[in-house]
UniProtKB/Swiss-Prot annotation:
<keyword id="KW-0793">Thylakoid</keyword>
<feature type="transmembrane region" description="Helical; Name=XI">
    <location>
        <begin position="707"/>
        <end position="727"/>
    </location>
</feature>
<feature type="binding site">
    <location>
        <position position="670"/>
    </location>
    <ligand>
        <name>chlorophyll a B3</name>
    </ligand>
</feature>
<feature type="transmembrane region" description="Helical; Name=II">
    <location>
        <begin position="135"/>
        <end position="158"/>
    </location>
</feature>
<dbReference type="GO" id="GO:0009535">
    <property type="term" value="C:chloroplast thylakoid membrane"/>
</dbReference>
<dbReference type="InterPro" id="IPR001280">
    <property type="entry name" value="PSI_PsaA/B"/>
</dbReference>
<keyword id="KW-0812">Transmembrane</keyword>
<keyword id="KW-0004">4Fe-4S</keyword>
<keyword id="KW-0249">Electron transport</keyword>
<feature type="transmembrane region" description="Helical; Name=VI">
    <location>
        <begin position="369"/>
        <end position="395"/>
    </location>
</feature>
<feature type="binding site">
    <location>
        <position position="568"/>
    </location>
    <ligand>
        <name>[4Fe-4S] cluster</name>
    </ligand>
</feature>
<feature type="transmembrane region" description="Helical; Name=VII">
    <location>
        <begin position="417"/>
        <end position="439"/>
    </location>
</feature>
<dbReference type="GO" id="GO:0015979">
    <property type="term" value="P:photosynthesis"/>
</dbReference>
<dbReference type="Pfam" id="PF00223">
    <property type="entry name" value="PsaA_PsaB"/>
</dbReference>
<comment type="similarity">
    <text>Belongs to the PsaA/PsaB family.</text>
</comment>
<feature type="transmembrane region" description="Helical; Name=IV">
    <location>
        <begin position="273"/>
        <end position="291"/>
    </location>
</feature>
<keyword id="KW-1133">Transmembrane helix</keyword>
Length: 734
């Protein structure tokens, strides 16, 4: 008899019901729970999967390059990046009638195409790519790299090339190599690319495989480097009149500290970015030589952590025990990595629009909106994942003996204080923010808008002023010409920065008022509520008032409601599940705020946001309803336009989202009855009953139904808003 799926669990493979399939899928990646799994084998499997992951990423990026080179308009776009719409790829659809063919043939193409809103054209242009041939070469290189990585993954599963457990747990070596190699040397290599290829191309000088060894990136060559006269590399930067991609107004500097933006492309100066990457390379290459490995010099991480015990005794055993706890817990490591990556991804969202690094991207408004929304949602999912694995760490890996009295144990000991403080913060923020919004709504409804409670965000304005924004008249720090801070930077980066922050042509430190004050606190409410649910879920994962140790219940024990007392208190999975709703809710507010504020600024109508954002009906009517008109009119009895696809996606997203509730607001009994009724009918229907199955159909578990509901809710939510952002922005600005 052939062994049934799943091969990794004998118990599951012998289950006579459909539970075998669903639990098999659910635990396929939970390597720890597989039959016969050893710690060494676990690490080896995860290590090999990294290669596969990278191979998929490079295959995908190779596909981006290939399709743009084949079906895009990169070379035409370069000639006029502000007017020509970048094409992602062609659309082939046999269902298209003539009106659709006409509507979707845009960006100067003779056939239906998708417009690229990812910013890749701007990126490739900025880093020195100029022809379709460049794109094809890049695609081929990444394809080969992908194949090499796949081979590497396979190779590291072969007995001779499997790393041992001690190799995976050698923290100092890993830190040295990752800091020096992954961050340091790669940043140095990128600096090299910017200096040798991107900067010359931005000045109209071609550098390619044919001449890169002979073209000097700087007229003085390496002489200033070896003589220590490094400032030569910063002399003669590009002028404010430089035309990007030509030598008109171009200088010769390669490493500068100009500050602000290139006036024509409205992106950061390439020479500033090269300098930045060089600095990062130096810092990280040095950092990667700090930890003790084969030669008895450098830091030992265990010694550092064990020494972290403040003499006052207020942190108990301090960081003692953490070295082994973190080294031996993959969930703890993953939680820390996800949290760090989540923060970085959100920072990318913020910096990508406030300080655009790519030429002309600041003027491609739909791309700006897409990239912000995309990165904020990804940050949200990464953050909830961090806490989910934190909770799994407490259930599976936390050893109370090993961590006696240290900071981890103390977090658990005073978790009631942490949770209750978070709870008070959320209650305060929630009632006060909603109270202000509702008061203002009522005043608007009764025709007395002057009675609204409008609070100026004076502290935030003061912070903006201290960074150099002159508008508010706070004579403080960088907004004061006589301040010592202003004088210290006045001959290097400050002139460019101050010009940029006060120019009104970009998104640096946008002017803020009462509407911003309110939505800031609404977002703070969302962030704190999400944090409260996640923190409680993780801290209570192992033990709570009702259940001193929950280790044997596992992470995904179901919350069964008040009928089975206390089950919700012991379900870490349920905290994660609830937190995802709040995370989506919060990022909804964040992206609504960003998008509405920006489209009013881009349209030269900032007053609309300022006046309508102080009450809820303003958000519903003047942001959501007003901007959904292109979606509602995407196709109608009179035909269609090139926003029709987003209209369809808007409907489809709502449908997926609403489907989620079918799984969220129902219990297992209903599904079991439905399944058995369908199975009964199937078995008695001619022709249909030729198809039979051996597994007895069983309704999904409570946790699985919640997961299916949550997945539909999340996917539908994101799809709906994606369609809204794209159609409402592209409908206004093309």
């Amino acid at each position: 008899m052939a062994t049934k799926f799943p091969k990794f669990s004998q118990a599951l493979s012998q289950d006579p019901t459909t539970r075998r399939i669903w639990y098999g899928i659910a635990t396929a990646h939970d390597f720890e729970s597989h039959d016969g799994m050893t710690e060494e084998n676990l690490y080896q499997k995860i290590f090999a999967s990294h290669f596969g992951h990278l191979a998929i990423i490079f295959l995908w990026t190779s596909g981006n390059l290939f399709h743009v080179a084949w079906q895009g308009n990169f070379e035409q776009w370069i000639l006029n990046p502000l007017k020509v719409k970048p094409i992602a790829h062609a659309i082939w659809d046999p269902h298209f009638g003539q009106p659709a063919l006409k509507a979707f043939s845009k960006g100067g193409s003779a056939y239906p195409v998708n417009i690229a809103y990812s910013g890749v054209y701007h990126w490739w242009y900025t880093i020195g790519m100029r022809t379709n041939q460049d794109l094809y070469t890049g695609a081929l290189f990444l394809l080969v790299l992908s194949a090499i990585l796949l081979f590497g993954g396979w190779l590291h599963l072969q007995p001779k090339f499997k790393p041992g457990l001690s190799w995976f747990k050698n923290n100092e070596s890993r830190l040295n190599h990752h800091l020096s190699g992954l961050f340091g040397v790669s940043s140095l290599a990128w600096t090299g690319h910017l200096v040798h290829v991107a900067i010359p191309e931005s000045r109209g000088q071609h550098v390619g495989w044919d001449n890169f060894t002979t073209v000097l990136p700087h007229p003085a060559g390496l002489q200033p480097f070896f003589s220590g006269n490094w400032s030569v590399y910063a002399q003669n930067p590009d002028t404010a009149q430089q035309l990007f991609g030509t030598n008109e107004g171009a200088g010769t500097a390669i490493l500068t500290f100009l500050g602000g933006f290139h006036p024509q492309s409205q992106s950061l100066w390439l020479t500033d970015m090269a300098h930045h990457h060089l600095a990062i390379a130096v810092v990280f290459i040095v950092a990667g030589h700090m930890y003790r490995t084969n030669w008895g010099i450098g830091h030992n991480l265990k010694d550092i952590l064990d020494a972290h015990r403040p003499p006052s005794g207020r942190l108990g055993a301090g960081h003692r025990g953490l070295f082994d706890t973190i080294t031996n817990s993959l969930h703890m490591q993953l939680g820390l990595a996800l949290a760090a990556l989540g923060v970085i991804t959100s920072l990318v969202a913020q910096h990508m629009y406030a300080m655009p690094p790519y030429a002309f991207m600041a003027k491609d408004f739909t791309t700006q909106a897409s990239l912000y929304t995309h990165h904020q949602y990804i940050a949200g999912f990464l953050m909830v994942g961090a806490f989910a694995h934190g909770a799994i760490f407490f259930v599976r890996d936390y050893d109370p003996e090993q961590n006696k009295g240290n900071v981890l144990a103390r977090m658990l000991e005073h978790k009631e204080a942490i949770i209750s403080h978070l709870s008070w913060v959320t209650l305060f923020l929630g009632f006060h923010t909603l109270g202000l919004y509702v008061h203002n709504d009522t005043m608007i409804a009764f025709g007395t808008p002057e009675k609204q409670i409008l609070i100026e965000p004076v502290f935030a304005q003061w912070i903006q002023a201290s960074s150099g924004k002159a508008l508010y008249g706070f004579d403080v720090l960088l907004s004061s010409s006589s301040n010592i801070a202003t004088q210290a930077g006045s001959n290097i980066w400050l002139p460019g920065w101050l010009e940029a922050i006060n120019s009104g042509k970009n998104s640096l430190f946008l002017t803020i008022g009462p509407g911003d004050f309110l939505v800031h606190h609404a977002i703070a409410l969302g962030l704190h509520t999400t944090a409260l649910i996640l923190v409680k879920g993780a801290l209570d994962a192992r033990g709570s008032k009702l259940m001193p140790d929950k280790k044997d219940f596992g992470y995904s024990f179901p919350c069964d409601g008040p009928g089975r007392g206390g089950t919700c208190d012991i379900s870490a999975w349920d905290a994660f599940y609830l937190a995802v709703f709040w995370m989506l809710n919060t990022i909804g507010w964040v992206t609504f705020y960003w998008h509405w504020k920006h489209i009013t600024i881009w349209q030269g109508n900032a007053t609309q946001f300022n006046e309508s954002s102080t009450y809820l009906m303003g958000w519903f009517r003047d942001y959501l309803w007003l901007n959904s008109s292109p979606l509602i009119n995407g196709y109608n009895p009179y035909g269609m336009n090139n926003l029709s696809v987003w209209s369809w996606m808007f409907l489809f997203g709502h449908l997926v989202w609403a489907t989620g509730f079918m799984f969220l607001i129902s219990w297992r009994g209903y599904w079991q009855e439905l399944i058995e009724t369908l199975a009964w009918a199937h078995e008695r229907t001619p022709l249909a009953n030729l198809i039979r199955w051996k597994d007895k159909p069983v309704a999904m578990s409570i946790v699985q139904a919640r997961l299916v509901g949550l997945a539909h809710f999340s996917v539908g939510y994101v799809l709906t808003y994606a369609a809204f952002v794209l159609a409402s922005t592209a409908g206004k600005f093309g």
